[in-house]
Amino acid sequence: AAMLHNSGFEQYEISAYGKTPSQHNINYWEFGDYIGIGAGAHGKITDIKTKKVFRTLKPKSPRDYLVEFSRNDIESSAKVIDNLTFEFMLNSLRLKDGFNVELFETRTGQPFQVLNSKLDKAIDLDLIQIQKKCIRPTKKGFNFLNELQEIFL
């Protein structure tokens, strides 16, 4: 980590360093939508009308992928995400700078208050901090990210 820092790279995510953060990665960690194209590809799509969030998974085999593609059967590979709060926290807490309260509400469709009791527990354990509507892991929380994420399970 010191060698990367001395070379101008900063850690912006638990497993990523860069001179500037990767926008693709940031979108993923901020629970944004992305389209999976091709054999074995994964995607995440939000249906604006129903407020449902879907994960998509394409068949790994190129032959099976082409069969599905020729049927134009998007629904068969889409699964509704049941626990949006946990999925959001699982992703966003990986970011060193955390996330904004409004982002949580926009991406999950839930009021931020649904997190209150779990945030209180994480704060009591010195794993998370809240500053100006921004939630981020403390240094301890970043070092013990699995334990922090488990609180929101």
Report the location of each language-model feature.
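Minor-groove-contacting beta-hairpin "wing" of winged helix-turn-helix DNA-binding domains
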Residues: 134-138
